[in-house]
Protein backbone atom coordinates (compact mmCIF):
# COMPACT_ATOMS: atom_id res chain seq x y z
CA UNK A 1 0.00 0.00 0.00
CA UNK A 2 1.22 3.49 -0.87
CA UNK A 3 1.70 6.00 1.92
CA UNK A 4 1.41 9.78 2.17
CA UNK A 5 2.56 11.45 5.39
CA UNK A 6 1.09 14.91 5.93
CA UNK A 7 2.74 17.03 8.61
CA UNK A 8 1.11 20.29 9.71
CA UNK A 9 3.63 22.70 11.21
CA UNK A 10 2.96 24.99 14.15
CA UNK A 11 3.82 25.71 17.76
CA UNK A 12 2.38 23.61 20.61
CA UNK A 13 0.34 25.13 23.42
CA UNK A 14 -3.00 26.89 23.75
CA UNK A 15 -1.37 30.32 23.48
CA UNK A 16 -0.42 29.57 19.86
CA UNK A 17 -3.79 28.22 18.70
CA UNK A 18 -5.11 30.03 15.62
CA UNK A 19 -1.96 32.13 15.22
CA UNK A 20 -0.71 32.72 11.68
CA UNK A 21 2.31 30.46 12.22
CA UNK A 22 -0.02 27.55 13.04
CA UNK A 23 -1.81 27.51 9.69
CA UNK A 24 -0.28 24.13 8.87
CA UNK A 25 -1.38 22.38 12.04
CA UNK A 26 -4.80 24.06 11.75
CA UNK A 27 -5.21 22.54 8.29
CA UNK A 28 -4.36 19.06 9.57
CA UNK A 29 -6.97 19.44 12.31
CA UNK A 30 -9.51 20.38 9.65
CA UNK A 31 -8.60 17.21 7.77
CA UNK A 32 -9.13 15.18 10.94
CA UNK A 33 -12.61 16.66 11.30
CA UNK A 34 -13.38 16.15 7.62
CA UNK A 35 -12.35 12.48 7.66
CA UNK A 36 -13.65 11.92 11.21
CA UNK A 37 -10.38 10.65 12.68
CA UNK A 38 -8.79 11.48 16.03
CA UNK A 39 -5.18 12.40 16.69
CA UNK A 40 -3.32 10.13 19.11
CA UNK A 41 -0.08 11.01 20.88
CA UNK A 42 3.02 9.03 19.94
CA UNK A 43 6.27 9.69 21.81
CA UNK A 44 8.34 8.07 19.08
CA UNK A 45 7.31 10.75 16.57
CA UNK A 46 7.38 13.65 19.06
CA UNK A 47 3.80 14.50 18.19
CA UNK A 48 0.37 13.07 17.47
CA UNK A 49 -1.02 11.33 14.41
CA UNK A 50 -4.10 9.82 12.80
CA UNK A 51 -4.51 7.41 9.87
CA UNK A 52 -7.14 6.70 7.25
CA UNK A 53 -7.35 5.12 3.81
CA UNK A 54 -8.16 6.66 0.43
CA UNK A 55 -8.24 4.04 -2.34
CA UNK A 56 -4.94 2.17 -1.99
CA UNK A 57 -3.23 5.00 -0.07
CA UNK A 58 -2.56 5.06 3.64
CA UNK A 59 -2.89 8.71 4.66
CA UNK A 60 -1.08 9.66 7.86
CA UNK A 61 -1.78 13.03 9.48
CA UNK A 62 0.81 14.30 11.94
CA UNK A 63 1.21 17.38 14.13
CA UNK A 64 4.59 17.76 15.90
CA UNK A 65 4.69 18.63 19.59
CA UNK A 66 8.01 20.40 19.03
CA UNK A 67 8.20 24.15 18.49
CA UNK A 68 8.31 25.39 14.91
CA UNK A 69 12.08 25.90 14.90
CA UNK A 70 12.57 22.24 15.91
CA UNK A 71 10.05 20.71 13.49
CA UNK A 72 12.78 18.58 11.96
CA UNK A 73 13.06 16.49 15.11
CA UNK A 74 9.47 15.29 14.76
CA UNK A 75 9.53 14.93 10.96
CA UNK A 76 12.72 12.85 10.97
CA UNK A 77 11.31 10.62 13.73
CA UNK A 78 7.98 10.25 11.89
CA UNK A 79 9.80 9.41 8.65
CA UNK A 80 11.57 6.57 10.41
CA UNK A 81 8.54 5.43 12.46
CA UNK A 82 6.20 5.23 9.46
CA UNK A 83 8.94 3.99 7.11
CA UNK A 84 8.34 6.55 4.37
CA UNK A 85 10.69 8.18 1.88
CA UNK A 86 11.08 11.96 1.73
CA UNK A 87 9.05 12.21 -1.50
CA UNK A 88 6.12 10.59 0.38
CA UNK A 89 6.02 13.48 2.87
CA UNK A 90 3.86 16.58 2.43
CA UNK A 91 4.75 19.43 4.78
CA UNK A 92 1.90 21.91 5.33
CA UNK A 93 3.08 25.34 6.50
CA UNK A 94 2.34 29.06 6.61
CA UNK A 95 3.79 31.24 3.87
CA UNK A 96 4.58 34.95 4.19
CA UNK A 97 5.10 35.42 0.46
CA UNK A 98 1.52 34.47 -0.45
CA UNK A 99 -1.51 36.63 0.27
CA UNK A 100 -3.90 35.59 3.01
CA UNK A 101 -5.62 32.30 2.25
CA UNK A 102 -3.79 31.59 -1.00
CA UNK A 103 -2.93 27.88 -1.24
CA UNK A 104 -0.02 26.61 -3.32
CA UNK A 105 1.59 23.19 -3.77
CA UNK A 106 5.31 22.87 -4.30
CA UNK A 107 7.40 19.84 -5.26
CA UNK A 108 10.60 20.09 -3.16
CA UNK A 109 12.86 23.17 -2.94
CA UNK A 110 14.76 25.14 -0.30
CA UNK A 111 13.53 26.49 3.02
CA UNK A 112 12.86 30.03 1.72
CA UNK A 113 13.69 31.49 5.13
CA UNK A 114 11.02 29.41 6.90
CA UNK A 115 12.56 28.13 10.13
CA UNK A 116 10.33 25.06 10.26
CA UNK A 117 11.44 23.98 6.79
CA UNK A 118 15.04 24.85 7.64
CA UNK A 119 14.91 22.52 10.66
CA UNK A 120 13.36 19.71 8.60
CA UNK A 121 16.01 19.93 5.90
CA UNK A 122 18.75 19.98 8.55
CA UNK A 123 17.37 16.89 10.33
CA UNK A 124 16.97 15.06 7.02
CA UNK A 125 20.67 15.66 6.38
CA UNK A 126 20.10 18.22 3.66
CA UNK A 127 17.33 16.29 1.89
CA UNK A 128 14.74 18.80 0.66
CA UNK A 129 12.84 16.48 -1.69
CA UNK A 130 9.69 16.44 0.45
CA UNK A 131 6.58 18.11 -0.95
CA UNK A 132 4.95 21.22 0.50
CA UNK A 133 1.55 22.83 0.80
CA UNK A 134 1.99 26.56 1.39
CA UNK A 135 -0.81 28.47 3.09
CA UNK A 136 -0.59 32.22 2.56
CA UNK A 137 -0.73 34.44 5.63
CA UNK A 138 0.37 37.69 3.97
CA UNK A 139 3.39 39.82 4.91
CA UNK A 140 3.54 42.56 7.56
CA UNK A 141 5.52 44.78 5.19
CA UNK A 142 8.62 45.17 7.33
CA UNK A 143 10.99 42.32 8.12
CA UNK A 144 11.44 43.52 11.70
CA UNK A 145 7.73 42.89 12.29
CA UNK A 146 7.71 39.29 11.02
CA UNK A 147 8.21 37.49 14.36
CA UNK A 148 5.37 39.27 16.14
CA UNK A 149 3.22 39.03 13.00
CA UNK A 150 3.42 35.24 12.63
CA UNK A 151 2.98 34.63 16.36
CA UNK A 152 -0.17 36.75 16.55
CA UNK A 153 -3.69 35.89 15.50
CA UNK A 154 -5.05 37.41 12.28
CA UNK A 155 -7.99 39.78 12.29
CA UNK A 156 -11.48 38.27 12.28
CA UNK A 157 -11.92 38.94 8.56
CA UNK A 158 -8.48 37.51 7.74
CA UNK A 159 -9.19 34.45 9.85
CA UNK A 160 -12.53 33.82 8.16
CA UNK A 161 -10.98 34.16 4.71
CA UNK A 162 -8.16 31.78 5.63
CA UNK A 163 -10.54 29.21 7.11
CA UNK A 164 -12.79 29.36 4.04
CA UNK A 165 -9.83 28.87 1.69
CA UNK A 166 -8.43 26.02 3.78
CA UNK A 167 -11.80 24.27 3.87
CA UNK A 168 -12.06 24.55 0.09
CA UNK A 169 -8.56 23.02 -0.15
CA UNK A 170 -9.41 19.89 1.87
CA UNK A 171 -10.34 17.88 -1.29
CA UNK A 172 -6.78 18.42 -2.57
CA UNK A 173 -5.60 15.46 -0.50
CA UNK A 174 -8.00 13.08 -2.23
CA UNK A 175 -7.05 14.62 -5.57
CA UNK A 176 -3.35 13.98 -4.91
CA UNK A 177 -4.14 10.31 -4.38
CA UNK A 178 -6.58 9.86 -7.28
CA UNK A 179 -5.26 12.30 -9.90
CA UNK A 180 -1.60 12.57 -8.97
CA UNK A 181 0.67 15.46 -8.09
CA UNK A 182 0.99 17.23 -11.45
CA UNK A 183 -2.73 17.26 -12.31
CA UNK A 184 -3.62 18.46 -8.81
CA UNK A 185 -1.09 21.31 -8.98
CA UNK A 186 -2.34 22.40 -12.41
CA UNK A 187 -5.98 22.38 -11.28
CA UNK A 188 -5.23 24.25 -8.03
CA UNK A 189 -2.99 26.90 -9.51
CA UNK A 190 -5.22 27.56 -12.54
CA UNK A 191 -8.24 28.04 -10.26
CA UNK A 192 -6.24 30.41 -8.04
CA UNK A 193 -5.14 32.44 -11.07
CA UNK A 194 -8.76 32.79 -12.19
CA UNK A 195 -9.70 34.06 -8.72
CA UNK A 196 -6.87 36.60 -8.84
CA UNK A 197 -8.07 37.86 -12.24
CA UNK A 198 -11.69 38.24 -11.14
Give residue ranges: language-model regions:
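Glycine-rich phosphate-binding loop at the start of an alpha helix
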Residues: 114
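Nucleotide and nucleotide-moiety/phosphate-recognizing core
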Residues: 2-107, 118-133, 140-145, 152, ...
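Conserved TIR/SEFIR loop-to-helix hotspot centered on a Trp-containing motif
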Residues: 111
Amino acid sequence: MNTLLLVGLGNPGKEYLNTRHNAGSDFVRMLCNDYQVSLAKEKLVHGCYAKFIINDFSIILCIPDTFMNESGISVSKAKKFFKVDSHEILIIHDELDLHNGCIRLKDSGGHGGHNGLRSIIDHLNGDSSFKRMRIGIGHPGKNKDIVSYVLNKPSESERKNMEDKMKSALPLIESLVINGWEKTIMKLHSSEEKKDES
